[in-house]
Amino acid sequence: MIGLNHQFLLKNLVSKMKISKDDIKKYLPHRKPFLFIDEVVNIDKNNEIHARKMITSNEYFLEGHFPGNPIFPGVIIIEALGQASGILGFVTMDKTPEEGSIYVLAGVDKVRFRKRVRPGDTIDIYSKVLGEKKGIWKFDCRAELNNELVCSAIILCADRKVT
């Protein structure tokens, strides 16, 4: 099990922090059409982020997933969990991608999908730091729709230098 071995845990934050839509781009190098975090509701001192993704009928991949019965793809939900975890990692370490670092998806464990997500839905995304070891961060993640579990997963992100 990865254990926390640093005293960096949100040292500069008060009990809650909200990140504006523009500031999301300071913490994530992703851009449209591959930016899947629309809002960061809060990041708290317990090392947890609450973010949101609003699903619109304009999502480019819904045309083919599935014609006449659009369902937001599970792999994109996993990506959104990873992006929320990346924001949390950057905030926790008090740095941004501009400083030459990036969080890349290193693994996904224990994935379960429980409910379909469709255009018009808004999913709430939660990620909590479980630990860090040698630059590999472990997060306990879930996505919810109307307070019902949509997806759960353990996400691993690697903190790497941009080359």
Language-model features: locations:
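Extracellular/lumenal ectodomain signal focusing on beta-strand-rich modules
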Residues: D38-N42, K110, S152
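Catalytic strand-loop segment that frames the active site of acyl-thioester-processing enzymes
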Residues: K32-F72
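Short aromatic-glycine motifs in intrinsically disordered, low-complexity regions
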Residues: K21-R31, E98-E99
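HotDog/MaoC-like acyl-thioester-processing domains
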Residues: I2-N5, L13-K16, P29, K45-N46, ...
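Hydrophobic core residues within well-ordered beta-strands of beta-rich domains
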Residues: F34-F36, I123, W137
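Hydrophobic beta-strand-centered segment that forms part of the acyl-chain substrate-binding groove
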Residues: L9, K16-K18, G86-D124, V150, ...
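Active-site helix/loop of acyl-thioester processing domains in fatty-acid/polyketide metabolism
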Residues: V40, F72-P97
